[in-house]
């Protein structure tokens, strides 16, 4: 399989996971997460400098997610790095879940910022 097909397949998996998370939670909207799947896959695969085994490395690049409703996209790509399990993705938007509807900072798991309402983040 060539790199282009592999990248497309990975993005498709992010889309499937995002839609599944929202469907299982019966809450949220997957459009943004599905639309951003290719972008976030390329960003994490090709451009971000980070080490999933050393999440507090000072030289790492940081990915800040402003629109928290796109969290299924973030959790999915972080699951590919081993930071979340499929069982944790299934708990999306549940009380006490490690995958809340709007991410809460947890650097050890790859979430660099708490996101809230649109427009409250970085531009």
Name each region found by the language model.
Residues 30:
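Flexible, glycine/charged-enriched surface loops at secondary-structure junctions
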Residues 1-8:
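Basic/polar N-terminal segments that are highly enriched at the extreme N-terminus
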Residues 21, 36-123:
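Cofactor-binding active-site loop characterized by glycine-rich and histidine/acidic residues
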Residues 11-27:
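N-terminal capping segment at the start of a domain
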């Amino acid at each position: 399989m060539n790199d282009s097909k592999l990248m497309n397949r990975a993005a498709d998996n992010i889309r499937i996971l995002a839609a599944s998370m929202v469907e299982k939670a019966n809450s949220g909207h997957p459009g943004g997460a599905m639309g951003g799947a290719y972008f976030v896959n390329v960003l994490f695969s090709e451009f971000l400098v980070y080490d999933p085994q050393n999440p507090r490395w000072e030289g790492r690049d940081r990915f800040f997610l402003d629109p928290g409703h796109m969290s299924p996209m973030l959790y999915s790509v972080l699951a590919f790095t081993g930071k979340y399990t499929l069982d944790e993705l299934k708990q999306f938007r549940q009380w006490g879940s490690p995958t809340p509807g709007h991410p809460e900072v947890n650097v050890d798991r790859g979430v660099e910022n708490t996101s809230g309402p649109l427009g409250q983040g970085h531009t």
